[in-house]
């Protein structure tokens, strides 16, 4: 369960339990930056369930780190704590006009192509695509998602095709790339690694024109 910060959603515990209700044997990982401390009554609902916390430590920015650790220990919830380190610059939205082989390489190198995202009734495999579409920063292309509210008779087949995608999505051409190792990636067009918690200044308010 990822965000932003998932604990900002008041129903985060309810959502997590809903995922586990579908398959009680699975393990759910909740990613947090320890800016918000979960409530005791929320953590109590995970008793006997496979819930783990993955805590990214941003030093002073993770202002509730001690409280979060104390709460997780109190409720015997496993956690993993890791320093934030660096971010990969991949925030710009722009059309690259890549060839098909280059698009396949972008997709091959991507670390976010299996981060399934449900937004406004549409299922995506990539949070970049879902958020760019929500901002209307990229053209609406039905090949990028599955509309779960559609009246299609072959919805299951569409979902299966989406999650098994091996080539690329049309929206990949608007992405700088999300490689595991930007220094080695062949098709990465961002600015490399930046210190976690720091933002790259943007000269204009929006780096794209709205698509309609």
Model segments located where?
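Accessory C-terminal segments flanking Radical SAM cores
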Residues: 94-200, 206-209
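Conserved glycine-rich "GG(E/T)P / GGGxP" loop and the immediately following alpha-helix
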Residues: 1-108
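ER/Golgi luminal nucleotide-sugar-dependent glycosyltransferases, focusing on the catalytic module
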Residues: 212
């Amino acid at each position: 369960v990822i965000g932003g910060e998932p604990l900002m959603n008041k129903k985060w515990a309810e959502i997590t339990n809903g995922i586990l209700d579908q398959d009680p044997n699975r393990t759910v990982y909740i990613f947090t930056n320890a800016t918000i401390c979960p409530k005791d009554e929320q953590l109590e609902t995970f008793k006997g369930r496979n819930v783990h916390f993955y805590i990214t430590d941003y030093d002073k920015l993770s202002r509730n780190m001690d409280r979060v650790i104390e709460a997780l220990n109190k409720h015997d919830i496993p956690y993993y704590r890791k320093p934030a380190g660096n971010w990969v610059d991949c925030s710009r939205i722009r059309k690259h006009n890549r060839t098909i082989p280059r698009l396949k390489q972008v997709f091959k190198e991507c670390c976010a192509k299996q981060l399934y995202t449900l937004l406004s009734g549409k299922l995506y495999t990539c949070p970049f695509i879902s958020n760019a579409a929500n901002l209307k920063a990229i053209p609406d292309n039905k090949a990028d998602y599955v509309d779960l509210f559609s009246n299609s008779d072959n919805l299951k087949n569409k979902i299966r095709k989406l999650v098994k995608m091996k080539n690329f999505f049309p929206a990949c051409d608007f992405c700088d790339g999300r490689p595991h190792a930007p220094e080695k990636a062949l098709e990465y067009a961002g600015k490399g690694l930046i210190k976690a918690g720091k933002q790259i200044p943007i000269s204009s308010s929006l780096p794209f024109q709205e698509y309609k």
